[in-house]
């Protein structure tokens, strides 16, 4: 048992107060509490305070501090409950305090995993052109329950997936380097896979997108062949042709086009 000997605002924060408790047979105790905790327990000078009540006061203040930390964390963008819990845990809050804070945040709609998941899917498909598989993995990492992930991804229609994947394909086509049609398609396939699009969507987009014209393929082959020629020109002709075929075939060019180029440049030094 003890008695509150003094209550005074702290210099650093006007919303926090020093409380000095004189305890029977023990050193005086000094602690700070939030003004809301002060009002919640109706603390005042001269009030007798038991050890049990003191523990409740300290716990309530821990919850209040963690709640304020959570609000600051949420001020930047929407967060999942898992993100908030991880942030508070990193700040040193015990699980019991985190549970209390999340309960309060849910009641006040500051956290809502259903709304968070739906907004996350909308944002990632529109601003980052991500496919559903990548979005799913990110939501799982953010701790969103499977049921809510399924529910939010149900709004990511197949038509939307196709449209976004086609847009990425067309962008890659405009930036196409001097490469074979096969190499180009494989590069785009890998890009779409990294973006999280399912195989059936990728296959459909690549099938619909078309490839190089024959002239474009020849031009790309010519560029790559000139590069390979500079590497292998010092070899005797049989070895030179073997290495040229191997290098250009690895680049995805057809053997008939490679042989045609070699015939046309048979007299090159």
From Swiss-Prot:
Keywords: Cytoplasm. It comes from the Bacteria. Belongs to the RecX family. This is Regulatory protein RecX. It comes from Geobacillus kaustophilus (strain HTA426). The gene is recX. It is found in: Cytoplasm. The keyword Cytoplasm applies. It holds the Pfam family RecX_HTH2. Modulates RecA activity. NCBIfam families: PRK14135.1 (NF010733). GO terms for cellular component: cytoplasm. InterPro entries: RecX_HTH_1st (IPR053926), RecX_HTH_2nd (IPR053924), RecX_HTH_3rd (IPR053925), Regulatory_RecX (IPR003783), WH-like_DNA-bd_sf (IPR036388). GO terms for biological process: regulation of DNA repair.
């Amino acid at each position: 048992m003890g008695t509150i000997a003094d209550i005074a605002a702290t210099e650093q924060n006007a919303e926090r107060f020093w409380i000095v408790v004189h305890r029977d047979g023990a050193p005086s105790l000094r602690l700070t509490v939030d003004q809301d905790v002060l009002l919640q327990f109706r603390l005042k000078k001269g009030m007798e305070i038991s050890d049990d009540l003191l523990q409740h006061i300290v716990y309530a203040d821990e919850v209040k501090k963690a709640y304020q930390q959570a609000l600051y964390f949420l001020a930047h963008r929407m967060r999942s409950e898992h993100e908030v819990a991880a942030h508070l845990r990193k700040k040193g809050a015990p699980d019991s305090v985190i549970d209390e804070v999340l309960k309060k945040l849910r009641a006040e709609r500051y956290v809502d995993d259903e709304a968070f998941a739906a907004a996350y899917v909308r944002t990632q498909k529109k601003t980052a052109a991500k496919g559903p598989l990548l979005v799913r993995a990110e939501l799982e990492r953010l701790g969103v329950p499977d049921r809510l992930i399924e529910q939010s991804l149900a709004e990511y229609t197949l038509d939307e997936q196709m449209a976004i994947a086609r847009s990425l394909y067309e962008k890659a086509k405009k930036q196409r380097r001097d490469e074979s049609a096969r190499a180009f398609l494989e590069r785009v396939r890998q890009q779409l896979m990294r973006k999280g699009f399912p195989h059936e969507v990728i296959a459909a987009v690549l099938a619909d997108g078309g490839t190089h014209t024959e002239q474009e393929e020849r031009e790309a082959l010519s560029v790559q062949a000139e590069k390979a020629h500079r590497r292998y020109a010092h070899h005797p002709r049989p070895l030179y042709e073997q290495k040229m075929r191997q290098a250009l075939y690895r680049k995805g060019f057809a053997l008939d086009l490679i042989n045609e180029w070699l015939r046309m440049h048979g007299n090159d030094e």
